[in-house]
Amino acid sequence: MKDFLPAFWAVIPAAGIGARMAADRPKQYLQLGGLTILEHSLLCFLDHPRLKGLVISLAVDDPYWAALPCAKDARIQRVDGGSERSGSVLNALLHLHAQGASDNDWVLVHDAARPNLARSDLDNLLGELADDPVGGLLAVPARDTLKRADSSGRVLETVDRSLIWQAFTPQMFRLGALHRALADSLVSNVSITDEASAIEWAGQSPRLVEGRSDNIKVTRPEDLEWLRQRRTEFGR
């Protein structure tokens, strides 16, 4: 890892509702240790000295953001989100271009509901990818036995996990390359699940940088309960 870490922009797509949480508000606005999940997800970036600025993509009718203290942070700029993650990220990238950001600038895209990113993981990602020609993402090697199933839920085979990784965020790519990949994939009606898949579709191979397994995304109620319990155990 390089001793000198590159400057970067952060993009947080936060226009989703998180239906699987079955909560009274979008999951990023649920409480975790006195702050919302979203605030925790932002903090690791806002505390970093190499941050150039942060763009958050929000639902047009979002009623929660303005009440958060961080909404007044001058380093954070708000844009309207899209109907899908890729559209929300693309809107943020277009905003960065309009603000004069360079195609060669690094952009880190992070899930709004991934509140446990460690500073050490962020620094490691920045250092490992500083000179990478493509970029990459935090990820964790698969640990459990993996099964491939048919449409009825019956096991077809056990998958070799030795080369299987779970994709996490942040995902770090050059602004211009990511902008082109997302825009082209949308025009071609390609299903894009994360930024790395857009770069893959464009013919590039992102690098996997191993991170901590506790950098989880809150998707179901038990995920939030696990994080709350963990914070209690460690006194945070």
Swiss-Prot record:
HAMAP family: IspD. The record marks R161, K217 as: Positions MEP for the nucleophilic attack. The record marks R20, K27 as: Transition state stabilizer. InterPro entries: IspD, IspD/TarI, IspD/TarI_cytidylyltransf_bact, ISPD_synthase_CS, Nucleotide-diphossugar_trans. Pfam families: IspD (PF01128). NCBIfam families: ispD (TIGR00453). One of its GO terms (molecular function) is 2-C-methyl-D-erythritol 4-phosphate cytidylyltransferase activity. One of its GO terms (biological process) is isopentenyl diphosphate biosynthetic process, methylerythritol 4-phosphate pathway. Pathway: Isoprenoid biosynthesis; isopentenyl diphosphate biosynthesis via DXP pathway; isopentenyl diphosphate from 1-deoxy-D-xylulose 5-phosphate: step 2/6. It catalyses: 2-C-methyl-D-erythritol 4-phosphate + CTP + H(+) = 4-CDP-2-C-methyl-D-erythritol + diphosphate. This is 2-C-methyl-D-erythritol 4-phosphate cytidylyltransferase.
